[in-house]
């Protein structure tokens, strides 16, 4: 039986490898960046069309469940890096969920 393009005997190894990737690090960096630099309305629209209240609730839950890493870089130099990390994190999340459900 096949799960996407990964055979059943290789599925555990594939999922273990994906799970070992540091997928929460970009989220913790984003939480730290958000808390130090309040997002503008334009950035809130980019981040999934969430209103300010829901975004605050979402980030507070993530901040309570996962430790926030030290994020010492300056905002202007890290905008593109944070955006690419968030996109990469969602891509990895999609891949894991794809292999669990299909």
From Swiss-Prot:
Membrane topology, as annotated: Multi-pass membrane protein
Positions of transmembrane segments: 13-33, 82-102
Signal sequence region: none
Localization of this protein: Endoplasmic reticulum membrane
Chain coiled-coil ranges: none
Tissue expression summary: Expressed in placenta with lower expression in brain, kidney and testis.
Keywords from the named record: Endoplasmic reticulum, Membrane, Transmembrane, Transmembrane helix
Tagged with keyword Chloroplast: no
Superkingdom as given in the UniProt entry: Eukaryota
Cellular component terms per the entry's GO annotation: endoplasmic reticulum membrane
Keyword Nucleotide-binding in annotation: no
Major location (coarse): endoplasmic reticulum
Name of the protein: Protein PAPPAS
This protein's encoding gene: PAPPA-AS1
């Amino acid at each position: 039986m096949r799960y996407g393009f990964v055979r059943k005997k290789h599925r555990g190894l594939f999922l273990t490898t994906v799970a070992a990737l540091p997928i929460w690090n970009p989220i913790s960096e984003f939480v730290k960046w958000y808390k130090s630099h309040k997002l503008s309305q334009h950035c809130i629209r980019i981040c999934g069309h969430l209103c300010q209240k829901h975004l605050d609730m979402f980030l507070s839950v993530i901040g309570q469940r996962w430790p926030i890493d030290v994020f010492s870089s300056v905002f202007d130099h890290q905008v593109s890096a944070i955006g690419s990390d968030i996109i990469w994190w969602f891509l990895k999340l999609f891949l894991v969920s794809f292999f669990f459900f299909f």
